[in-house]
C-alpha cells in the first residue's frame, strides 16, 4: 500500500474518531432530554431530516435502539427546538461518518479485504464504549453502532444473510443482532439449506444455532460443520426471552400456541397465569403469532421480534421459567475470521 493511500486511510480514521466522540456525547444528551417522546413521531422526524447517504431505515433502526433503552422519564422538559437540533446534528454526523467509512471501504476492498470484518467491528465497539460517559449503558451504544456499521456496509454492498427460518424466529433475531437491519435477509427451511446457500454463493453469510443452555447441542449444525468447507466467522449469544403475544388482554386468552420447545420453557408461567387456557403445539413460533393476530382469545409464545414483524401486541414479557436460557448461534462464511489477539478468540473442534 502506497504512502498516499496510507495517509488517506489515517485521515479518514481520524475523522471517524472525532465524529464518534461527538455522536456518543450527543446520544447521551438526547437520552436525558426527551423522556416523554413518542417513538413513531421521533422516527418520522429523523427520517424527514435525513439527507443521506444513510437510508431512512438505518437511521430509524439507530433511534429505535436508542429509545428501546428508555429515554429518561424524569428528565426536565426542554424546548422541542433543542431536541430537534440535537437530532439534526446526530443525523448529520452519522452521515459524515458513513462517507468516511465508505472511503476506507473502497481502499480496503481494492486490496481484497472483505466487506464484513468481525475483528474490526469488535475494535469499533470497544472504542465507542470507552468514549461513553453515560447515562446510556454500553449495550445500547453497541446496539446503536451495530446499526451504523450495518448501514455503512449496505452502502458498499447489500450483503445477503441466510438463516434457519421462518422469519422472526430467534435465529432471525440473532442474525439481525449480529449484522443490523440494513442487509438482505433470507430464510431457509433447513440448516442444510443455510450451508448450501453460502457454499453456492447465493448468500454471503449464514446463521445457524449450535447449542442451547437448557436443550444442549444442535447436532445437525455440528454435522454440517464436519461436512462443509465453510468457516465459523463469528458467534452470537442470544438470551431467549419469550413473550406472550396476543391482540386480546391476558384475562381474555383461552388458547396459547407455539412450538413445543417454547411452550415447555414457559410451562410454569402458563400454569400460574393462564391455568385454564388450552396449550397447543404448533409448527413454528412465527406461525403461532400469525394465528394469534387473526384470532381473538388466542396468544402465542414467541420473540418480541415476532410481535414487531406481525404487528401484534405483547401482553407479557419474560414468560420463560428460567432466565438463564441462552442459545449460541454461529455466523458461517467462506473466509476465516481474523483473530482479535485480546484473549477472547475461540477455536472450535468438531470430532
Feature-to-residue mapping (PLM):
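Domain-level signature for soluble enzymes in the chorismate/prephenate branch of the shikimate pathway
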Residues: 1-351
Amino acid at each position: 500500500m502506497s504512502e498516499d493511500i496510507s495517509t488517506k486511510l489515517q485521515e479518514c480514521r481520524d475523522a471517524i474518531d472525532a465524529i464518534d466522540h461527538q455522536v456518543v456525547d450527543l446520544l447521551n444528551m438526547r437520552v436525558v432530554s426527551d423522556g416523554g417522546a413518542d417513538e413513531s413521531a421521533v422516527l418520522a422526524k429523523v427520517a424527514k431530516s435525513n439527507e443521506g447517504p444513510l437510508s431512512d431505515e438505518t437511521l430509524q433502526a439507530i433511534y429505535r435502539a436508542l429509545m428501546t433503552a428508555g429515554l429518561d422519564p424524569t428528565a426536565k422538559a426542554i424546548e422541542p427546538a433543542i431536541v430537534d437540533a440535537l437530532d439534526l446534528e446526530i443525523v448529520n454526523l452519522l452521515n459524515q461518518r458513513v462517507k468516511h467509512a465508505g472511503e476506507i471501504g473502497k481502499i480496503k476492498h481494492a486490496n481484497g479485504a472483505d466487506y464484513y470484518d468481525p475483528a474490526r467491528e469488535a475494535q469499533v465497539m470497544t472504542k465507542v464504549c470507552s468514549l461513553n460517559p453515560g447515562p446510556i449503558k454500553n449495550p445500547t451504544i453497541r446496539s446503536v453502532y451495530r446499526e451504523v456499521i450495518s448501514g455503512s456496509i449496505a452502502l458498499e454492498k447489500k450483503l445477503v444473510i441466510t438463516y434457519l427460518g421462518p422469519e422472526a424466529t430467534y435465529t432471525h433475531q440473532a442474525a439481525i443482532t449480529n449484522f443490523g437491519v440494513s442487509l438482505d435477509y433470507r430464510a431457509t427451511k433447513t440448516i442444510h439449506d443455510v450451508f448450501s446457500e453460502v457454499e453456492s454463493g447465493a448468500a454471503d453469510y449464514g446463521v445457524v444455532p449450535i447449542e442451547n443452555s437448557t436443550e444442549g447441542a444442535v447436532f445437525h449444525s455440528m454435522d454440517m460443520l464436519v461436512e462443509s468447507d465453510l468457516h465459523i466467522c463469528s458467534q452470537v449469544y442470544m438470551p431467549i426471552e419469550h413473550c406472550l403475544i396476543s391482540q386480546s388482554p391476558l384475562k381474555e386468552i383461552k388458547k396459547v400456541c407455539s412450538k413445543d420447545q417454547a411452550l415447555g420453557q414457559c410451562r410454569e408461567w402458563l400454569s400460574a397465569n393462564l391455568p385454564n387456557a388450552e396449550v397447543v403445539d404448533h409448527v413454528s413460533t412465527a406461525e403461532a403469532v400469525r394465528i394469534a393476530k387473526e384470532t381473538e382469545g388466542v396468544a402465542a409464545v414467541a420473540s418480541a421480534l415476532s410481535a414487531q414483524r406481525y404487528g401484534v401486541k405483547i401482553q407479557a414479557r419474560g414468560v420463560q421459567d428460567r432466565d438463564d436460557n441462552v442459545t449460541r448461534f454461529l455466523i458461517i462464511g467462506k473466509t476465516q475470521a481474523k483473530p482479535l489477539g485480546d484473549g477472547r478468540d475461540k477455536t472450535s473442534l468438531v470430532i
